[in-house]
Amino acid sequence: MGRRKIEIKAIKDDRNRSVTFLKRKGGLFKKAHELAVLCSVDVAVIIFGHNKKLYEFSSCDMRETLGRYQYYGPPHEHKGPEDFNGKRDDDDDEDETTPAPEEMQPTTQNPPAVVPAHIPSHPGFQHVNHAPSASPPISNGIPFDPRHGTPQPQGASRPSSRNHLRRVSSNLGPQQHHGTPPPPPQNGFAYIPNPSMYHPNANPNIAQQPRPPQFAHYGPQQPLPPHAIPPHPMPQPVPPHHQAPQHLPQHPHPLAQQTPAMGLSQPPHASIPQVAQPFLPEQGRNSMPPAFPTEQSQPPRPVSLPDVSSADQMVGPLKVETSPSPPHQRSLSSKSRSIFTPIDDRGSVLARHFGLGPPTCESPRTESADVKAEAKQNDSKEIKPPAQPVAPPPPPRTTADAARSQSAPDIKPPPRTNSGQLPSKRPQLKVQIPSENSDRGSATADSSSSTGNQTVTPAKANPDTNHSGVVLPPPSPSAGAILSAGATGPPNPFARPPPPGTASQNSNAYNSNNNIETPISALPSRFVSDALLPSPSSFFPEWGFGRSGPDTNMLPSPLTFPTPAVQTGPGFAREDEQEKKRKSPDSGPSIEGTAKKSKT
């Protein structure tokens, strides 16, 4: 009697609307609770407010309720705004406590009527699961048509919720509902969103870029469901393959469902990304198929297992490629090994001394061969045959004649195994330089007597090794290091044969200095003058320590741009002069340079 009727339409005034919302929301929750208790039913009410806040009431766990809704068939009764527009006059008694139609729909049978439209922004349970799925556009766009059991007005808003909720329940929904109810709605559209979850495994490359990282989550996740929640993985992959033909025309992003075919064809093409990914698909798919057999496993298996096999095949070729790669290097470097053939084939000094002291000739090289064998095993752990050929290499390296005396087929493997390590061999030339005296003392019986007093840098010795290889003259003063440097390495490209007199003088000078028998410097011979080096300033003339050109009296300026003629700042000129004074000991004319600079 005292209650006035209000027209059910949107309230424009913000204050009145907020008051009405709070009042009717409380009444709706109260009614929902009473209904749940009185009738022993599960009620879920979800309200998205204007202030972007979420209000929900649930007589039991909200996620469980939504998951159950996802797997139920078409609702037995569905109410929409049009159902209440004309009946409002008859229901005046309940008007005070019942909310507006938008708020009333979330009750028991149709909570998603409101949920769907807004669910992407749902901050609570939905948002967490919605992020991994990585396909909001797919879910929102897909399933308007496939929704068969409900009136069309709700079709627009409901499918989006259906998709998102399905993702939630696929991980969180109760297990007992998986078996029986799903089939009718599944063929409608129940699992459309799931291709986006499942096929990032099959086709992470074709899909959008954000998917592979999310697939990294699916790899760990899906091994778990087969053990913890067996039913979930089964329905997920199976329906997408059955339903893919139905929904491809309607699908805004057909990539997710075309992936079964593309996933098979892709691994051969995209070999580089597959290197990292074959393992992830194997995790996902090897864990998935065990769950499939309980339901229809035929469609997903062809898709999953071929990918796994193709992934294995991809891994296989990669392993094969990694193993052949050392042979390629060997073949390339075996060509470069031709540097050694002139020395070996002449058989010059080595052939003569090989019979005298073969152990000493081979001892340093067998060590180097062992080092190379270790390096080789590190390079290709899968190739173990080279370990056997490593034993023959020392003879072929020392002399080709000795190698030929063994057996012709043995020569072919060793160059491959050894020459693969040429890059590591060249440093060993310099490592073996200190041991040249021991080699010389034992192996070179002829030249040791004359060269015991005269040792020259191996840089200058190498050219003579070539000459001695041709004619074998009487041992020259520079033939000392022939075994260590000349036989094992290529001739020094920097070497310049010294004049005999200066060579002997230099060697005598070296020996007079504390009996230094090793080279006095490791620099190439082009930097070494005929006498002992006067000062380090002549090593690298381009460094500008001492100049021997037209600009001898000018030190190089530390500044590349012209310096100002007038002293603009006190500190600038002082620093400049200090630098020149500091350099004056190395080059005599620097004082003149400073004087000239200061005059200008």
Swiss-Prot record:
Keywords: DNA-binding, Nucleus, Transcription, Transcription regulation. Residues 75-89, 364-384 have a biased composition (Basic and acidic residues). Pfam families: SRF-TF. GO terms for cellular component: nucleus. Residues 243-260, 440-452, 503-515 have a biased composition (Low complexity). GO terms for molecular function: protein dimerization activity; RNA polymerase II transcription regulatory region sequence-specific DNA binding. Residues 222-242, 386-397, 490-501 have a biased composition (Pro residues). InterPro entries: MADS-box/MEF2_TF, MEF2-like_N, TF_MADSbox, TF_MADSbox_sf. Residues 1-61 form the MADS-box domain. It is found in: Nucleus. Belongs to the MEF2 family. MADS-box transcription factor involved in the activation of the dihydroxynaphthalene (DHN)-melanin pathway and the fumiquinazoline C cluster during conidiogenesis. Specifically recognizes a DNA binding site (poly A/T stretch) identified in the promoter sequence of the gene coding for the polyketide synthase pksP and of the fumiquinazoline C cluster (fmq) promoters. This is MADS-box transcription factor rlmA. It comes from Aspergillus fumigatus (strain CBS 144.89 / FGSC A1163 / CEA10).
